[in-house]
Amino acid sequence: MRKEVLDNELAKIEKISKEFGVKKVFLFGSCLESVETANDIDIAVEGIKAKDFFKYYGRISMATDNEVDLVDLDDIREHFQKRILTKGRIIYERAV
């Protein structure tokens, strides 16, 4: 995936994240290691209501041209959560 393509996809994800009022969105995984060889976009979301998670994921899937793997940061094992928080990159943060 080209960097320009990733940036475009992340802009779409940011817009949808604003609409859903999520707290933060992190990019992690292969896109951070090597954009050119990444097959998908790994993101973690923090502060989304459980009832809205699949609707949010559906909107992202419909809006993006690349496969997106989404995890709820509040609903994953602690060691995975810590890895995302330390190695991931914040791509969206709701204004306080």
List each language-model region with its residue ranges:
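Acidic Asp/Glu-based divalent-cation binding sites
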Residues: 40-42
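Short hydrophobic/aromatic beta-strand micro-patches
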Residues: 44-46
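Catalytic core of pol beta-like nucleotidyltransferases
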Residues: 1-26, 32-38, 48-96
